[in-house]
Amino acid sequence: MNSLLVDSGFWYAFHSPRDQYHEKAIEYGVYLENACIIFPYPTLYEILNTAFVKSKTSLGRMEELVNAPNTRCINDSKYLTSAMKLTFEKGNNKSLVDNIIRLMLDDDTLRIDGLITFNARDFYDVCAIRNIELISD
C-alpha cells in the first residue's frame, strides 16, 4: 500500500464543486482508494475551518476518512520550530503549513511514497530529492 501525503488544497477542491480544481481532484481520488493517507495536523486545521464544517455532508465524509484504518494523522510538533524559522526567513515565500509539509517530506523516518497537491512548485525539489511521486496538475 502506498503512503500518500495530501495537501489541503486537494481536500478543498475534492469537496467543493465550485473549486477550479474540483474535476482534477475527483480524477486524483483514484490514488486514495488503496493508499495509506497521511494527514499532517496542520492540513486538518486548514481544512476543518468554519466554512467547511457548515457542510454536514463534507464534514461527515472527512470524519470517515480521518478515522479510517488506512489513515495516519501526523503530529507536527517535531517540525514546528524549524518550520517557523523557515517561514520568517527572508526570501522564503512558503506558508507555515507548506514548510511543515516540506519538512515531513524530507524526514526519512516517515514513509511517504507520494504527494497530492495543486501547488507543485513549493514541493517539487524535496519530492525529487526523496524520490516521492508528485501527483499534481
Segments from the language model and where they lie:
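Metal-dependent nucleic-acid phosphoesterase active-site entry motif
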Residues: 1-21
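Alpha-helix capping/helix-boundary segments
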Residues: 10, 43, 79, 100-101, ...
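Phosphate- and divalent-cation-binding pockets in alpha/beta enzyme and binding domains
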Residues: 46-47, 82, 104, 125
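Helix-adjacent hinge/juxtasegments
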Residues: 52-76
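Active-site neighborhoods of divalent-metal-dependent phosphate/nucleic-acid chemistry enzymes
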Residues: 72-118
